[in-house]
């Protein structure tokens, strides 16, 4: 795998994590009271959690000396598991989108309650939610696996971790940055973005999950064919 492909994969896996109902929570925080404080701390908690999780997985991989090269048992198993999990999530979100029709998804009510929580609880639950879902966990694991397989020196591993974290945080950082520059100017755009995500969020998550799941499944099958 060349460097360009590696960084592209890490950004893609990170983006898959950032596309969740929690990134809609940031829009709601920025539309509510104390937007910079509450939204800023939430995003900081998200970034720290992403950095800590992928760093921990890399440390475990180095300690156990796991072989993550293409065609190895560990890599093939992870690719097939991750691909299957993401395809399952994509199909579930697609079916849910059709079932909801024009009605707001059921999780929108949970998001409204979530963003009304006290700030420490909000940040803590956001961090837990980031690593609790199976689809996010397989993306964290896959990101650590491709870095391990590349056999990079330590400083380049850190670049890889930062690339992944950037992808995982980009959709949260963009609206926060826009509010820091000029909240009044971007409020209509944030409100419009919230409405679009409430209406189409499940379809977006489904498309990304199916795309990444199909790619990882193809990698797993390719590894099996190499044997």
Where are the regions that the model predicts?
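Alpha-helical transmembrane segments
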Residues: 5-7, 74-91, 156-170
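N-terminal signal-anchor/start-transfer transmembrane helix
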Residues: 13-32, 36
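Membrane helix-loop-helix hairpins that form the core translocation module of multi-pass transporters
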Residues: 35-108
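Transmembrane helix boundary and interhelical junction motifs in multipass membrane proteins
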Residues: 18-26, 132-143, 172-173
């Amino acid at each position: 795998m060349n460097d360009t492909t590696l960084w592209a994969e890490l950004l893609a896996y990170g983006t898959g994590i950032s596309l969740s109902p929690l990134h809609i929570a940031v829009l709601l925080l920025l539309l509510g009271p104390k937007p910079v404080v509450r939204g800023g701390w939430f995003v900081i908690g998200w970034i720290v959690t992403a950095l800590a999780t992928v760093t921990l997985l890399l440390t475990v991989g180095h300690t156990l000396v796991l072989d993550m090269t293409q065609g190895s048992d560990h890599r093939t198993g992870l690719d097939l598991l991750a691909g299957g999990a993401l395809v399952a999530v994509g199909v579930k979100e697609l079916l849910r989108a059709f079932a909801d029709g024009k009605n707001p998804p059921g999780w929108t009510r949970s998001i409204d309650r979530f963003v009304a929580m006290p700030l420490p609880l909000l940040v803590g639950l956001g961090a837990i939610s980031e690593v609790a879902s199976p689809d996010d966990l397989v993306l964290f694991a896959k990101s650590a696996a491709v870095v391990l397989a590349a056999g990079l020196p330590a400083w380049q591993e850190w670049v890889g971790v930062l690339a992944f974290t950037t992808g995982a945080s980009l959709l949260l950082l963009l609206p926060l940055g826009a509010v820091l520059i000029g909240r009044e100017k971007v409020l209509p755009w944030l409100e419009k973005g919230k409405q679009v995500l409430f209406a189409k969020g499940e379809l977006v998550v489904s498309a990304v999950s199916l795309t990444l799941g199909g790619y990882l499944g193809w990698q797993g099958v390719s590894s099996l064919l190499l044997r």
